[in-house]
Amino acid sequence: MGVRAVCELFAMSSRYPISVGFSLETLARRGGHNGPHKDGWGVAYFEERDVFLLREPSPAAESDLVRFMEVNGPPSNLVLSHIRLATQGEPALCKTQPFQRDLGGQAHVFAHNG
């Protein structure tokens, strides 16, 4: 039985806000260049009770937005990113993670693998 590729996640939690440009760049390369994860990408930057969420249903390795965020992404205490390898259906924004829900006046963001 061979190894099956799955989606990949990157998360960072820090006491102080930091930039994740280098880590985002490394993950983005796996999103269609060094890896098969070409079916979408997303990143969430948290700031207190708010979240800044970006997603695209296209390869992260080819995204001008990813390149921009690698240099200009906001420093954050908490970052969650995901690159998608579709196992069902075509790439679509509604299937691109992280997902966001607002409950009780607070943004909740999640991503999963499988």
Show the residue positions of the predicted features.
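Short, well-ordered loop/turn elements at secondary-structure boundaries
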Residues: R4-V6, H37-D39, P74-P75, L93, ...
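A short, Trp-centered hydrophobic/proline-enriched beta-strand micro-motif
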Residues: G42, V79-H82
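Short acidic (Asp/Glu) patches
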Residues: P57-M69, I83-Q106
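Short, surface-exposed secondary-structure junctions/capping segments
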Residues: F68-L78
